[in-house]
Amino acid sequence: MAESSAATQSPSVSSSSSGAEPSALGGGGGSPGACPALGAKSCGSSCADSFVSSSSSQPVSIFSTSQAGLSSLCSDEPPSKSMTSSFLSSSEIHNPDPTTPLGEKSETLGSQFVLAKGKDPLVLLDKKKLDSPQGTNKDRVDAPVSLATGIPCSHPSIPDSFPEQPAFLSKEIGPAEEWVVKDQEPKNPNKVPDGEDRSALDFGQSKAEHICTYSLSPSELPVASVEKDSPESPFEVIIDKATFDREFKDLYKENPNDLGGWAAHGDRESPADLLEMNDKLFPLRNKEAGRYPSSVLLGRQFSHTTAALEEVSRCVNDMHNFTNEILTWDLDPQAKQQANKTSCTTESTGLDRSELRSEIPVINLKTNPQQKMPVCSFNGSTPITKSTGDWTEAFTEGKPVRDYLSSTKEAGGNGVPGSSQLHSELPGSMPEKWVSGSGAATVEVTLPNLRGAWPNSVMGEVTEVDSSGESDDTVIEDITEKPDSLPSAAAKTSEREIKETPSRETVRSEMCENSEQPQAQPETPTQKSLEGEVASQVPNTLNEVTPEKLDMTNNPKVCSAAPPSVLNETGFSLTVPASAKLESLLGKYVEDTDGSSPEDLMAVLTGAEEKGIVDKEEGDVLEAVLEKIADFKNTLPVELLHESELSGSETKNIKSKYSEDSRETTGGAPTMSPDLEQEQLTIRAIKELGERQAEKVQDEGISSGGKLKQTFAPQSGPQSSSDILEHTDVKTGSDLGIPKNPTIIKNTRIDSISSLTKTEMVNKNVLARLLSDFPVHDLIFWRDVKKTGFVFGTTLIMLLSLAAFSVISVVSYLILALLSVTISFRVYKSVIQAVQKSEEGHPFKAYLDVDITLSSEAFHNYMNAAMVHVNKALKLIIRLFLVEDLVDSLKLAVFMWLMTYVGAVFNGITLLILAELLVFSVPIVYEKYKTQIDHYVGIARDQTKSIVEKIQAKLPGIAKKKAE
């Protein structure tokens, strides 16, 4: 497409560009940029547009001879955005008047083409082909055109470095013809290239190798476009469809494969119907196909006149009608017929596979089951299609698909042809691209209607894919690590299916060496919805065939005695990754069978179990599975106990909260019930843990809030590990063939952990917190000398003050001292802020904002702790004063009699001072002289005991009472 300097990016008609310098296409017949590598037949089927113009405003006939050119009009975009590149052949631009002066400008789509005076255009064309070097287009002016939103378009380059020179737009397209208005002057004859020129054009096209891929968006469309009824436009569109049908009907029948496979119906349908069918199939092609058919890339530019807009409107309406009809068609026979045609496609194109790489893969329904096409969903109501907006995202970076082709080769060239890999090499700009390595064929297939078709098509292959154990590269991911990237069954391909494909398609077998290996795609919401329904219809089959995957495909439903919130908090699941050894075992059982039904696979597994095909590797795998589940259960939080304890009103038996009634698991894959021995070990382990916990709570006074999490962790090895869950979901050796029964969770009552009441637990909790907050032990043993000295000095001064003054005086002086300090500091800060003119605010703002409110729960805790001691004191006083025990009451009497003498010598404050001195001195002295002190204390104790025995011997009443 030629462009003027006034409207460089404009593919529209411009009548104000007469002052621009002429420009023409660079690179003649052999130029790589002259024509995309689309094949001789493909280019032959897409003839160029012809625009004949002169200095005067004469009517010009504009008619597209490219079938795919009009197909762009039937896309979902408005007509203003749906424009194609106009490829003009040098044989179409003529200057019939030999007297035309050099420099006279001829307007064609906003570009001036200067014709040589007195020269034959075809002679100049041949001369230009021979003189122009190949691959030397340095000055390129690539005008972006829009086929649909973001569709890559290939067009020739335009050098703009030939001012004031005769130039000709050339393009190797095959039979380029010119259409002229009937009432035009006879001086504008029609010229058609003869056989020599056509063969030269075909020979030149075989050298074209460079393909420029553009990522286009609506923002790149030019603004300078002619309005619908612009009076300034010198062009008039006259569409002669009858002549078009008469001239090109044979051409459609010659090239059925280049038109995307829909031309197979050419014998019984008119070219207009074929054109409409191609228009409907083209916009609905999915993004995985890589590129679009070669014939679609050749089009023309429209002048946006009334006739063209009416044609566009008609095509768009027909497209919508056809889209509604195609969803109800049964295209299964058509898909098979198109798959059989692929064997002769490459030969008909005449391309050299060693030089040209096709960027349009051959789509096969058998090997690409997850290919997203315009199909009906499973409920038959919602069509699943790919919009053209997604194509824009795939090409936003503007990178040629050939670059991705090389990365695909590196990723998939080393594996087995049937292996399935995660395609991590593809960048984010092409999330769902499937690229084929070689060949130039394009076969458009439509996924058959999946409604009620489980025995065939994709459903049958899903079962084969997951159940065959032959794919060594199958990626198995953990649910907890990547919950959104699970490999679905529909994204895997069986090796057996790939091996069947080359036998049916000989051409693809040659291309299979480099790039036929499919790559696993990232999931999209549409694909997830498809795969979710597929997986929901085959939950039992997939999990029975691969028993080592514990509910990997379906949503895992963990049957446990613990509440569901625990599993949600911890993020763990009973998902055990498949072992390579177990996969190899399954592979040995399945590799001889070629059946596609799950019943055949289950029969093979059952037969293998009956024959006793169990060896050492199986035992090792089972041990690994057991250890995996044991590790998982060891990590279960035991904070469940505390949560259920708080939820109950009174908990005398903490563990009894976790014994649940018998129930059977529903949904998900069936699992094996644990062995009787394993159940006994589980119950025994839980009982031992409960008894041990009760002893620890009673001896150490551990609170139920924080310590239970650590002490209740299982410590009895892998067999009895954890089995806090009331059952064990462990796969044993009999899983391979024996039919599975649902797991039954038995009601198990566990002994009480502790006989302590809730009040006692709270009391111990408060005391433990007080001891931890105030390290009295470290304080009285002088671990921190500064801290101990400060506390000891302050308390001693206060006690001495109380000894010298009254309590009221001491309290008053203390309050006055504190207020003097705070008020002085407050005034000082206010003066400093006034002098410095700063706004630091209140100096005690941080302390004022401290929340010291006592909650009702904390108050109740403290009161409960205090009431325990008050109740004990009241009970003791009643026992002593009511003489429940005479000896105890006598002891109290003797003690009080001795205290009368002490009170006569010392008052209460003096006793407190003495007590403080003893508290801060005796522990440290005892720590230093522990051995000697213990020796002398032992001697004193023995002497005291002997004296008491002598006294009791002399008092017979007391002796009898003690004997009783």
UniProtKB/Swiss-Prot annotation:
One of its GO terms (biological process) is apoptotic process. Pfam families: Reticulon. Residues 1-32, 68-109, 179-200, 479-536, 645-674, 697-723 are annotated as: Disordered. Residues 776-964 form the Reticulon domain. The modification Phosphoserine is found at S31, S217, S225, S230, S233, S270, S303, S429, S529, S596, S597, S673. Residues 712-723 have a biased composition (Polar residues). Residues 796-819, 877-899, 904-926 dip into the membrane without crossing it. The modification Phosphothreonine is found at T593. It is a multi-pass membrane protein. One of its GO terms (cellular component) is endoplasmic reticulum. Its main location: endoplasmic reticulum. The keyword Phosphoprotein applies. May be involved in membrane trafficking in the early secretory pathway. Inhibits BACE1 activity and amyloid precursor protein processing. May induce caspase-8 cascade and apoptosis. May favor BCL2 translocation to the mitochondria upon endoplasmic reticulum stress. Induces the formation of endoplasmic reticulum tubules. Also acts as an inflammation-resolving regulator by interacting with both TRIM25 and RIGI, subsequently impairing RIGI 'Lys-63'-linked polyubiquitination leading to IRF3 and NF-kappa-B inhibition. This is Reticulon-3. It comes from Mus musculus. The gene is Rtn3.
